[in-house]
Amino acid sequence: MAISLATKAATDALKVNRAPVGVEPQEVHKWLQSFNWDFKENRTKYPTKYHMANETKEQFKVIAKEYARMEAAKDERQFGTLLDGLTRLGAGNKVHPRWGETMKVISNFLEVGEYNAIAASAMLWDSATAAEQKNGYLAQVLDEIRHTHQCAFINHYYSKHYHDPAGHNDARRTRAIGPLWKGMKRVFADGFISGDAVECSVNLQLVGEACFTNPLIVAVTEWASANGDEITPTVFLSVETDELRHMANGYQTVVSIANDPASAKFLNTDLNNAFWTQQKYFTPVLGYLFEYGSKFKVEPWVKTWNRWVYEDWGGIWIGRLGKYGVESPASLRDAKRDAYWAHHDLALAAYAMWPLGFARLALPDEEDQAWFEANYPGWADHYGKIFNEWKKLGYEDPKSGFIPYQWLLANGHDVYIDRVSQVPFIPSLAKGTGSLRVHEFNGKKHSLTDDWGERQWLIEPERYECHNVFEQYEGRELSEVIAEGHGVRSDGKTLIAQPHTRGDNLWTLEDIKRAGCVFPDPLAKF
């Protein structure tokens, strides 16, 4: 049958002008911008002192369909590996006990950071006016929801497959009494969501993600693998695949305010404050968790810190922002000095107050001590002597009634909490750079440990009103505080925290009560 002239004409035209068989995502992204609309006013909760330009672009140009396809593929690989392959191999019980305890802290604390990053990214969406910039922030909101679930899933997985689930399965209610909890909230919550949206972007994207993502999320996979943990790398490396887009969002935030006069006036100060506050917590806490919470070491924390924070971020990353007037933080040099001893100083406080935690802490053994001395000359004569004395006095034995915190007080070594960072500090035993200084404001005394934090506090003392663990529990007996904070296992009497990783000789509330440890307020003497 002969075809019609119209059909023939159409066929000939298609031969010359082939119909498209697909559309590139970048073309769709460009087309979607035509559907943008102007907002009469931004609805952000807090005003910003910066003006974000209306023509700012998004580097990755993500569209919802491609984003969903990409993340679905990653989740299939991640959960498929965890729920099938690693479960069949019994991966949960191949983790060294010391590292399994460390992950009780890392995954739980990081979950809080990811959760608050949801709100931080949404605040930036509210503040931005450029359609592409809003699109980048929206994708990050979805990422942070995913990351929150992933961190929670690590604790869930450990709860089911690790031999000591206590701490993994109930840290959300127990963590509040811990001496490291309020400091974590300071960097992972207050800094991300409180106040100026652009300042929050500096805290989250420019410092938290661009600076500390690598020494946290990337480095932790190396330490985990070295200690038999295949669970954490499976999840955290999937998390890290999203972080580059978040760093790009921070870069675009800076680009969007580059021509704003407020940028020249405030940006470098905000960056320095954000960096110092975060490093004041992350530098000692991550070093302590990696080196003291592992059996098999990867490298000295000071080397990891120097590579990722000082060279990669402070030099290369911030250097790329130099054309927009951004400078490396003035406090970076002091932070570099902190990276050598600060985590060892914190370790003393963490071990001394172990009953308030939700993980089991084993003192460094002979092999650990040799490693510390080889990499931190002078460690043995200071920290090693204290740990060895504690062990002789019965640190691990519940019958001894020995609480290291009481030993510190009896020997004149008061533990203070830095008001700005909320990090514990023992000035009389510290080898780091800090020193104690005390101020009074609104009828309340405040301890501070360094020049940069003191400067921040003096400018805005009302911003740092959070009471610390000693003010909260002054005059209270330790076992009462533990019971009130649900720091016990399912039997209602055995502590979740323990001073060793064995299954015997477990401390109970009665053991703690016999010691008669009562919290004093160290600032009462001033």
From Swiss-Prot:
GO terms classed as biological process: one-carbon metabolic process
The record's InterPro entries line, in alphabetical order, gives: Ferritin-like_SF, Phenol_Hydrox, RNR-like
SUPFAM superfamilies named in the record = Ferritin-like
Residues annotated as binding Fe cation 1 are E114, E144, H147
Q: Where does Fe cation 2 bind?
A: E209, E243, H246
Describe the reaction catalysed, as an equation.
methane + NADH + O2 + H(+) = methanol + NAD(+) + H2O; methane + NADPH + O2 + H(+) = methanol + NADP(+) + H2O
User: Per its UniProt record, what Pfam families does this chain match?
Assistant: Phenol_Hydrox (PF02332)
Catalytic residues, chain numbering? C151
Q: Which segments cross the bilayer?
A: none
- Signal peptide (residue range): none
Q: What is its EC number?
A: 1.14.13.25
What does the cofactor section's free text say about binding? Binds 2 iron ions.
Names of the cofactor(s): Fe cation
User: What does this protein's UniProt record list under function?
Assistant: Responsible for the initial oxygenation of methane to methanol in methanotrophs. It also catalyzes the monohydroxylation of a variety of unactivated alkenes, alicyclic, aromatic and heterocyclic compounds.
On subunit structure and binding partners, the annotation says: M.trichosporium has two forms of methane monooxygenase, a soluble and a membrane-bound type. The soluble type consists of four components (A to D): protein A, comprising three chains, in an alpha-2, beta-2, gamma-2 configuration, is a nonheme iron protein containing an unusual mu-hydroxo bridge structure at its active site and interacts with both oxygen and methane.
**According to its UniProt record, which protein family does this protein belong to?**
Belongs to the TmoA/XamoA family.
Name of the protein:
Methane monooxygenase component A alpha chain
Q: Which organism is it from?
A: Methylosinus trichosporium
Q: What is the lineage of its organism?
A: Bacteria, Pseudomonadati, Pseudomonadota, Alphaproteobacteria, Hyphomicrobiales
